[in-house]
């Protein structure tokens, strides 16, 4: 976890985690934080599933999850993978396995790069409405059954050098965990750690862990406790971040960001998904925007722009739109658009280029802190583009 000095550092210090390969994509603290999503097509619809995966890949998604609720769905993954490879798409595939999923997981492991299991459902017993408690003997007996059921999958993944996600959901904890720990972050962590310890006992370490909840405070507490527990027990597995069932629109994006960005700022997280009730490809820009905003992974131009006030000397909203349209393909640059000289030059000091209102009908162009020239406002955007070209930092858009 963060040291006292790191807490006040402007650089994010990631928790050190081991590298887990998911196909050709590495997940771990030595690698860029990977962006993933999940298609919403029926897996038995081969053509539809392939099309959905290709749309995600085109949007920049780096890992795609697919639901496999039956053996038939698991076998369909082989056809989906072959169809993708025939079209030149090698994006890693993850199978989502839930209720009593051993047979399904063993089949689908042949066709995917990672298997995701839900500890609360992998060995599933229907809840007993008359039960009042679990004795230690009963709790341990179920644990033994879980290990017996889970071990064959671990062995297959180990032999095939595939990865596993232990994906806990707050809403689907096993009955014995609820009775013992309650509907709490601790219950989520213990649910995951039971499976982590089994993997460790079988010398299998290609593990990624998620602790998702639909409420950000629960999710935050669960991930923090999970990281602390792993550190205490000597495990350094990567974390997959997400707020599940976040909804749609602005609020869904804000809710996801509240959870994911908070943990990323604390150094936790090695891969992420923003779960929206929208077309899956709409999740991807949100993921990259979160990473960009924190300075963790730069995949677009960073625009710095003031909110505008009575001192603004031009239509800032319109000009920002024009500047963005002209330069949005110049990934890696920081460009500032500021309304006046009162705060503009200082607040944009870290930008590569600046566009600042200088006087009525006049703007000044900056390179870093240095004013380069003044030009009429009507020529401002064109002059900014020319300055970038003069510096050799311009590339033509695709």
UniProtKB/Swiss-Prot annotation:
Q: Which cofactor does it need?
A: [4Fe-4S] cluster
**Superkingdom field:** Bacteria
What is the reaction catalyzed? Answer: (2E)-4-hydroxy-3-methylbut-2-enyl diphosphate + 2 oxidized [2Fe-2S]-[ferredoxin] + H2O = 2-C-methyl-D-erythritol 2,4-cyclic diphosphate + 2 reduced [2Fe-2S]-[ferredoxin] + H(+)
Entry's Gene Ontology BP terms = isopentenyl diphosphate biosynthetic process, methylerythritol 4-phosphate pathway; terpenoid biosynthetic process
GO molecular-function term, one example from the UniProt record: 4-hydroxy-3-methylbut-2-en-1-yl diphosphate synthase activity (ferredoxin)
Q: Which Gene3D superfamilies match?
A: Dihydropteroate synthase-like (3.20.20.20), Sulfite Reductase Hemoprotein, domain 1 (3.30.413.10)
Q: In which pathway does it act?
A: Isoprenoid biosynthesis; isopentenyl diphosphate biosynthesis via DXP pathway; isopentenyl diphosphate from 1-deoxy-D-xylulose 5-phosphate: step 5/6
Which InterPro entries does the UniProt record give? Dihydropteroate_synth-like_sf (IPR011005), IspG_bac (IPR016425), IspG_bac-typ (IPR004588), NO2/SO3_Rdtase_4Fe4S_sf (IPR045854)
Q: Where does [4Fe-4S] cluster bind?
A: 306, 309, 340, 347
Please provide the record's keywords in A-Z order.
4Fe-4S, Iron, Iron-sulfur, Isoprene biosynthesis, Metal-binding, Oxidoreductase
Q: What is its EC number?
A: 1.17.7.1
Q: Does the keyword Oxidoreductase apply?
A: yes
Task: Report the co-factor binding details.
Answer: Binds 1 [4Fe-4S] cluster.
Pfam families given in the database record: GcpE
The record's function comment reads: Converts 2C-methyl-D-erythritol 2,4-cyclodiphosphate (ME-2,4cPP) into 1-hydroxy-2-methyl-2-(E)-butenyl 4-diphosphate.
Q: Which PANTHER family match?
A: 4-HYDROXY-3-METHYLBUT-2-EN-1-YL DIPHOSPHATE SYNTHASE, 4-HYDROXY-3-METHYLBUT-2-EN-1-YL DIPHOSPHATE SYNTHASE (FERREDOXIN), CHLOROPLASTIC
Record's family? Belongs to the IspG family.
Protein name per UniProt: 4-hydroxy-3-methylbut-2-en-1-yl diphosphate synthase (ferredoxin)
Which source organism?
Synechococcus sp. (strain CC9311)
């Amino acid at each position: 976890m963060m040291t006292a000095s790191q807490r006040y550092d402007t650089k994010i210090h990631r928790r050190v985690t081991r590298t887990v390969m998911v196909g050709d994509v590495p997940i771990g603290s030595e690698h860029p934080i990977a962006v993933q999503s999940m298609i919403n097509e029926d897996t038995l619809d081969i053509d539809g599933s392939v099309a959905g995966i290709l749309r995600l890949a085109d949007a920049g998604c780096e890992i795609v999850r697919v639901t496999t609720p039956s053996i038939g769905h698991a076998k369909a993954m082989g056809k989906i993978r072959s169809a993708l490879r025939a079209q030149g798409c090698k994006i890693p595939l993850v199978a989502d396995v839930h209720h009593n999923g051993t047979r399904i997981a063993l089949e689908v492991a042949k066709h995917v790069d990672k298997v995701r299991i839900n500890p609360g459902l992998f060995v599933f017993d229907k809840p007993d409405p008359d039960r009042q408690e679990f004795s230690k003997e009963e709790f341990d007996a179920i644990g033994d059954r879980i290990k017996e059921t889970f071990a064959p999958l671990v062995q297959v993944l180990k032999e095939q050098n595939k990865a596993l996600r232990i994906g806990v959901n707050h809403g689907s904890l096993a009955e014995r965990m609820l009775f013992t720990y309650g509907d709490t972050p601790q219950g989520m962590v213990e649910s995951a750690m039971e499976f982590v310890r089994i993997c460790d006992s079988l010398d299998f370490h290609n593990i990624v862990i998620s602790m998702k909840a639909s409420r950000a405070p629960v999710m935050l507490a669960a991930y923090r406790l999970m990281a602390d527990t792993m550190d205490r027990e000597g495990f350094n597995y990567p974390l997959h971040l997400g707020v599940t069932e976040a909804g749609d629109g602005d609020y869904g994006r804000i809710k996801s960001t509240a959870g994911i960005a908070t943990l990323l700022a604390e150094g936790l997280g090695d891969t992420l998904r923003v779960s929206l009730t929208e077309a899956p490809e709409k999740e991807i820009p949100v993921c990259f925007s979160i990473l960009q905003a924190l300075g963790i992974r730069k995949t677009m131009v960073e625009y710095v722009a003031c909110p505008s006030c009575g001192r603004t000397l031009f239509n800032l909203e319109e000009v920002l739109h024009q500047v963005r349209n002209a330069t949005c393909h110049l990934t890696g640059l920081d460009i500032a658009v500021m309304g006046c000289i009162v705060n503009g030059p200082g607040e944009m000091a870290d930008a590569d280029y600046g566009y600042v209102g200088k006087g009525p009908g006049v703007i000044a162009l900056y390179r870093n802190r240095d004013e380069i020239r003044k030009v009429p406002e009507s020529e401002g955007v064109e002059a900014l583009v020319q300055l970038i070209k003069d510096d050799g930092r311009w590339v033509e858009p695709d």
